[in-house]
């Protein structure tokens, strides 16, 4: 019996954060035995915001090495760089012709990013969700892991797929209509200084973010200064509404140690201050990231190995993507190249 297909991507813009790991990359490693996984470094998406060429080049290789370091196995999964598979851009153009301007103008992420990058509101930024739809539909993905900020984009991909199928092939759909992948454990990491907001790798205030490749001393320093509260006497309990900072630190500690919130609350019952708890959180996070960082450094230094991973990944991805693109081209009446 064939496995359900999953598509997920990571953007090589800025340093990947612990939120990227706990919210996505760790799931990638865990899903490989049960799903037919297509994992992508989405460099085409990255250039919707102006990038320094050298920085983008290095960030793409960094992201690929991190994917491998966290346990993505190229023998089990297809791991590739988006721009190495031209079918993404080709299908993206075709899907543009089946997407309404009004649908894109309602995307909240476009509104947020266009406000942030007001001096460079380009067409690519506006059209980002259509390229994302192409990413998903090319591989017949049954499920797509999405965060709250991407739910709208997945809904659009579903709408485009359904629209195209209904026009050209209602009895034998060309595109699989994807469903969201809901993880069994929701690891949402919040900003260290404002735990009401999601941790973002692009946050200008770097005190809010822990990166995957961050030095241990820096990690511990940031967690020691992370938001808590002024409750007297202090208490360690998971109460997102009233103790967002502590709840966020408990989430990190749970993810790093495997302890449940109940076990953490019992361990720190009757604490007189938050300092010892923060110290333990910092040490646990460092211990979780150290083997990933060591493996990353080993892989990043082996360019020949990385080139082979990229080559094989692109070949596998292109073979599958070309089949879908061929069906879509035939459906709309394009003449096949002799």
UniProtKB/Swiss-Prot annotation:
Key words, A-Z: Aminoacyl-tRNA synthetase, ATP-binding, Cytoplasm, Ligase, Nucleotide-binding, Protein biosynthesis
Keyword check for Transcription regulation: no
Record-listed ATP binding positions: 11-13, 19-20, 147-149, 189, 198-202
Presence of the UniProt keyword Signal in the record: no
Subunit comment: Homodimer.
Record's function text: Catalyzes the attachment of tryptophan to tRNA(Trp).
Protein's name according to its UniProt entry: Tryptophan--tRNA ligase
Organism for this UniProt entry: Vibrio parahaemolyticus serotype O3:K6 (strain RIMD 2210633)
Classification of source organism: Bacteria, Pseudomonadati, Pseudomonadota, Gammaproteobacteria, Vibrionales
